[in-house]
Amino acid sequence: MRLHVLCLVFAAMIFAGCETMTGYSPGAGGYDSVPDGEKAQATFSGGDGSSIQQAVIIADATEKTGVRAEYIWLHERYPGYRLRFQGLRHEAGRVYDEMRIVAADGKSHTIFFDITPFFGKLR
């Protein structure tokens, strides 16, 4: 039960763009606001994010740098995207961030990030 509540609180803070938790909030209206050339303070591995099985794994990060890394990854691949939804999913003992975006060309995408390596690590 406590984990469920923690997940809901974390998701609410992300939706609200809480800068004290993540160090980042999406631009107004969910529009991409990452400056060109910003480098992630994390490492990426895994797949292309098109499914949970192909999730982008974010490692070597805290919650602050890991969440920021998600937005940087999206900016690098979908410049000018608009975030429509962000939520947590728990499957097979791992934690995923599901992000639904609309790319600048108008196409919708759902991207999965495996955030297990940094989930709950504030420092």
Where are the regions that the model predicts?
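Intrinsically disordered, low-complexity boundary segments flanking structured domains
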Residues: A42-S45, R68-W73, D97-R100
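Bacterial N-terminal signal peptides that target proteins for export
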Residues: M1-C7
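Post-signal peptide N-terminal segment of mature Sec-exported envelope proteins
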Residues: P26-D48
